[in-house]
């Protein structure tokens, strides 16, 4: 199983960051790689089990399912159902933690998935830098870093 871990400190209060990412359908509002997104079947975007269907800026479509959402812990876990990436059994978690020294937020985005040995390094780079770090960097820019 391949594991990816990316973290960052966002110079914004945790409630503000959580408000930006909480909706499972908000990805297109803050992630630069996402062209458009919708929740299938017009389900609520915070309903565990709902499916996010989005198109990438560079082409390609991804479908993801919300597995867990906690306002108390400020954490969201989801899986990929369909992706152009050569991965299987993908589960990711985006977690926020209040930084007590200042009005900041620690964000960590992790994933575990299976892929072939030959794709492992590329998928770690794609998910870690292309998805997670670019998303966290965009949040930092949007929220004032």
Model-based region annotation:
Residues 1-44:
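Hydrophobic ligand-binding cavity/cleft-lining segments
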Residues 36-40, 84, 97-98, 125-129:
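Juxtamembrane/interface motifs at transmembrane-helix termini
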Residues 6-10, 94, 109-111:
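A structural signal for short, well-ordered beta-strand segments
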Residues 28-29, 55-104, 112-115, 142:
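Hydrophobic-ligand binding "helix-grip"
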Residues 47-48:
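Short, solvent-exposed linear patches
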Residues 106, 112-145:
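A conserved amphipathic terminal alpha-helix motif
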């Amino acid at each position: 199983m391949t594991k990816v871990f990316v973290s960052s400190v966002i110079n914004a209060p945790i409630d503000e960051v959580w408000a930006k990412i909480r909706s499972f359908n908000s990805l297109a509002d803050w992630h630069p790689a996402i062209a458009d997104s919708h929740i299938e079947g017009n389900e609520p975007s915070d309903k565990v089990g709902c499916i996010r269907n989005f198109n990438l800026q560079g082409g390609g479509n991804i479908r993801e399912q919300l597995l867990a959402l906690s306002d108390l812990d400020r954490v969201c876990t989801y899986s990929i159902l369909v992706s152009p990436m050569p991965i299987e059994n993908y589960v990711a978690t985006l977690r926020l933690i209040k930084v007590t020294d200042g009005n900041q937020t620690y964000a960590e985005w992790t994933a575990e998935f299976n892929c072939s040995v030959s794709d492992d390094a590329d998928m770690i780079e794609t998910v870690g830098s292309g998805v997670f770090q670019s998303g966290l960097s965009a949040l930092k820019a949007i929220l004032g870093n």
